[in-house]
Every structure is written in C-alpha cells, then in structure tokens.
C-alpha cells in the first residue's frame, strides 16, 4: 500500500526479491496540471508495468476495503506513504501483521512530513524505520532501523530519494527476518516522540530576522513544496539553494551584494545568506547570477 515515488522503491524491491504481490493499494487517480486530466500515482504506474493487480478504494473504513483485503488473503501488509489511515481490522488481517516504511528515526518525527521537518530543524542524521503498524500514528513496535547522515546542502527532495532506496533495503531485510523467524521487535520510547505535521503554504515565506542557518534549513526543507519565497526588488521569487556566509553589520533583509557569486542578504543573527538559485514568478529555476542580468538589484552601500 503506497502512493508517491517514495513508495515505488519498496514495491520494486519486493518484486525483485521474488515475493508474490497479491494486490497493490494506492490512492485514487487525481487531476493533474491545468488540463485536470486524471493521472495515475507513481505506485500505480509501476504496478501496472509489472502486471500487478491495483486497487484504489476511496474509503478504508466502510467495510468494503476490509472485505477486499480478506479476499486477497495476504500474509503480510506493507505500507509506504499510502496517505490513508488504516483501521485495526485491516491491520490485523495478515498472519504476519502489517508493517510500515517510515522515513525517520522513530520515535522522532512521527507524522506526515518527517523528512522535511528533519531538515527544517537542522538535523545532521536521519534514517528509516520499519515498524509494526498500530492504532496510534507511527507508534508501533520497531523491527529495523537504518541511519544516514544529512549533508548540509541536501534538500528534502534529494533526501527523499535517498531514503526511498534505504527504506527499500531495510524492508527487504525485515521481510526476510520475518520469514526466517529471526525478527526482533522493540517498543518505542513514547516519552521521546516528536511530531512532523503536514506542511502549509505559508511556511515558505522567509523572515529575514531569523538566523541565516534557520533560513538555509527552511529553503532546503521546503523543496519541492511549498518552497521558500521572498521579495527581491519588489518581485516575489522562490529560493532553491543558499549558503551561509560570514558576518555583516547590515540590517536584516538588506541586499549586501549581488553579482556572479549570487545575492547576499543580511539575516537576523548578523550573518549573510547567499542565494544561489531561485525562480521568478512564471519563470524557470535559474542561477541567481542569471536572474540578475534581467533584474538588477540595488545594493546598500
């Protein structure tokens, strides 16, 4: 059970490992782009390419989905970014239970956006957790954990791709352990949990009175959506790549330099943040130096 690109890696690994996939559950087709043409989820596209049976129930709690799951007789349910809450009746159907591929080091960052919040909070390390699913969100017993460092320049989109592959590897190892009877479950430390709520569009607006490090993490953590944004010379731009520089005596929000190296803006902690890549409204993503050719900025002396 899964929907976005993140889940494709896990499904692909199960197929490559030779497991029988009795059914693939994914969210219903959604309108996409301006034409509002219905589009398949990435999981559905991959499943159909492999000749797998795809199911897209609109509700999981009305009894129809439960009847369908029971009809399929799964030995194990695997969930990866499905985007739906599963009732206990479904979770308890398979003899081996239901497990989830979660993109954080539980109990930290339970919830919908763990990858984004790890970067927003400036974490240096993250990973994936394979856990049993329980009634409470992301609170089930842990079966397997794999860790990885977060590069200071890595954004959420790039980290998601890496964790998808790491999650697929962890899932493969976990399923083999379950099959062999060697899996060990560890109860989460519920007193240590943190929550990673859904992102909102207003989170993208840059407040230059914040520290340069905070804004740098905001830029990285909100890619590809909603993206950090700010006004430069009266025009709103999305900011995609930055780096923290040295100290300045200029007021927060002041453009201290603008040239081939990028656009340097003063932040609330007295440091500069250099904008390296941005996207103007209605335009493409580009280097800040290219943007300046058509949009010169006034630099405060």
Regions found by a protein language model. Name each.
Residues 3-6, 58-61, 82-84, 245:
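Short beta->alpha connector loops
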Residues 27, 31-75:
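N-terminal glycine-/serine-/threonine-rich beta1-alpha1-beta2 phosphate-ribose binding loop
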């Amino acid at each position: 059970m899964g929907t976005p690109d993140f889940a494709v890696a896990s499904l692909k690994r199960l197929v490559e490992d030779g497991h029988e996939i009795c059914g693939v559950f994914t969210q219903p087709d959604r309108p996409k782009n301006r034409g509002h043409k219905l589009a398949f989820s990435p999981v559905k596209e991959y499943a159909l390419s492999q000749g797998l049976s795809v199911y897209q129930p609109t509700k999981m709690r009305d009894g129809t989905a439960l009847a369908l799951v029971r009809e399929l007789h799964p030995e194990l349910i695997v969930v990866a970014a499905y985007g739906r809450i599963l009732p206990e009746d479904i979770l308890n159907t398979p003899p081996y239970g239901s497990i989830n591929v979660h993109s954080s080091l539980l109990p930290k960052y339970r919830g919908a956006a763990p990858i984004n919040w790890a970067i927003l909070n400036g974490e240096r390390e993250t990973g994936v957790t394979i856990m049993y699913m329980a009634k409470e969100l992301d609170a089930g017993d842990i079966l397997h954990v794999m860790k990885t460092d977060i590069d200071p320049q890595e954004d959420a989109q790039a980290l998601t791709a890496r964790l998808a592959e790491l999650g697929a590897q962890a899932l493969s190892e976990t399923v083999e352990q379950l099959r062999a009877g060697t899996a060990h479950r560890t109860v989460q430390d519920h007193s240590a949990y943190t929550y990673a709520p859904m992102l909102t569009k207003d989170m993208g607006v840059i407040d230059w009175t914040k520290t340069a490090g905070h804004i740098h993490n905001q830029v990285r953590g909100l890619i590809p959506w909603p993206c950090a944004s700010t006004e430069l010379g009266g025009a709103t731009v999305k900011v995609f790549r930055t780096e923290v520089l040295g100290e300045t005596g200029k007021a927060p929000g002041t453009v201290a330099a603008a040239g081939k190296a990028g656009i340097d803006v003063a932040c609330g902690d007295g440091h500069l943040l250099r904008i390296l890549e941005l996207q103007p409204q209605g335009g493409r993503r580009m280097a800040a130096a290219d943007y300046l050719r058509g949009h010169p900025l006034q630099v405060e002396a």
